[in-house]
Amino acid sequence: MLGVLGGMGPLASAHFMTRLTLLNPASRDQDHIPAVLWSDPRIPDRTLGRRTGADDPLPGLLRGIRGLQQAGCGAIVIPCNTAHGWFDEMQAEGTPILHIVDATAKDLVDVLPNGTVGIMATAATLAMRLYQDRLEQLGWHCIAPTDEQMRSHVSPAIAAVKGNRVAEAYAPLAEMVLDLRDRGAGAVVLGCTEIPLGIQAGPWDTLGVPVVDSIDALARAAIRWARG
């Protein structure tokens, strides 16, 4: 049984469940992956929690982990990149957690074995260097939007998706993908699970650079685990 610790945000979690279903090679109900979704949007904001010391999300994260353990889950995925800033504390609960950055790195190899990769993520994910440290250890060079671009483009687009205004997110996110491409990125990692929803609200496949979707990467990792 796969556990999904979600609600961060709810639309991204629902999209993950859809992708988990569509990416799994199945021909009947019984071929799909048994899963329990714990969707708790009450968990305090992860970016504020990490950057400002506001309400701590860790108690809510651990409550979800323990609920999934009690449901009998043998592994857990968390379709929220920033929540992985508390990965060690959650992993200490004992049930294996499939790390979203490791999953994304595996997909990235297929489109850009080495070189410069752009990272689009929340300000907290970038500040914690969740992607930069792991990917640079594996040989990539990472670039990201500037602080001003985060304030003017990326953060408002993420907020738009969280507020169910998905169509509003495409233009600023597409502009950032193009900017990272023009700065030398051979691929762009969508390292926030709201960002793929915004990018896919428009003609994302015309941007002239491969994008690596952390939701799809995590879904594929979960499928590999389940099919074992």
What spans do the regions from the language model cover?
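Non-catalytic structural scaffold of enzyme domains
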Residues: 1-228
